[in-house]
Structures are given as structure tokens and as C-alpha cells.
Design a protein with these regions (language model features):
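Positively charged n-region of N-terminal signal peptides that target proteins for export
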Residues: 2-16
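N-terminal secretory-pathway/extracellular module detecting exported/lumenal segments
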Residues: 28-78, 83-134
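Short, solvent-exposed linear motifs at loop/edge-of-secondary-structure regions
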Residues: 1-4, 20, 30
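Sec-dependent N-terminal signal peptides
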Residues: 16-24
Length: 134
């Protein structure tokens, strides 16, 4: 058994605790709920714990796990704003991941707001909006 001074043992424990907290704190606070599985096998989730409603506007974190890789991406996460009064959505930020568990970004997060689009009938977005705009 290796001998480490008391100060060094405490420092290693602090580093280990910090790594543990950083690794698991974000996912433990999230409550990902599956809301759609498309015919192509893609599975959609939203984070129920971080839904923010302000009048007719709803901000929600959204995830997609692709059945087959899309341009080297196996999963996707975005923050979207849904306007319940006009049934539209705006992507506020988005990240593609090379793995199916949203841990390895394929590129930097895109923080540019995308143009508003109207929600299409029979889409995953419609199912999400129907759920959140009640």
C-alpha cells in the first residue's frame, strides 16, 4: 500500500469528488421523457425537469437518438422555444454528438438562434407542442 501524506490524500479526494459531481450532476437533475418514436427509428425526448413556461412561450430541452448515424452524428440535443399561440418553434441552440448518449460533441454547440418555423402536422414537434401547450 502506498503512503501519501494526509494533505495529498485529501486533495485527491476533493478532485475525485469534483469530477464525480461534474459528471453526474447535470444528468441527475434532468428528467428525460420519451415523447416520439418515428417510423425511421429515431427516438425523441424532452427534459421535463427544465421546461420553462412564460405565457404562450415554452422553452424546452429536446434530444434525438438517431437509429442510424446522420452525417457522423448519432444523437442531437437542442434548446427550443415553442410559441403555443401560433404553433411555431425556434431552435435557440443545438449540438450534434458522435455517440448515442449525448456525451461526445461532434462539433461546438451552435448558439445561433435559427429562424422560426411553423410546426408541421404529424411531426415529433407537433407531439411535443401538444404535450407542453396544454
Amino acid at each position: 500500500m502506498a503512503y501519501y501524506p494526509v494533505q495529498m490524500r485529501g486533495m485527491n479526494l476533493k478532485k475525485l469528488l469534483l469530477i464525480f459531481l461534474l459528471t453526474f450532476s447535470c444528468n441527475t437533475m434532468a428528467e428525460w421523457v420519451e415523447y416520439s418514436t418515428r417510423a425511421n427509428g429515431d427516438v425523441y425526448f424532452f427534459d421535463k425537469a427544465r421546461v420553462q413556461k412564460n405565457g404562450n412561450l415554452v422553452n424546452v430541452w429536446n434530444r434525438i437518438r438517431y437509429k442510424t448515424s446522420v452525417m457522423a452524428a448519432s444523437s442531437y440535443q437542442s434548446l427550443i422555444k415553442i410559441d403555443c399561440s401560433e404553433y411555431s418553434e425556434t431552435t435557440l441552440q443545438s449540438t450534434f454528438y458522435t455517440d448515442k448518449n449525448w456525451t461526445t460533441p461532434a462539433m461546438a454547440t451552435n448558439t445561433r438562434e435559427k429562424p422560426k418555423v411553423f410546426i408541421k402536422a404529424n411531426s415529433a414537434s407537433e407531439r411535443l407542442a401538444d404535450n407542453l401547450c396544454q
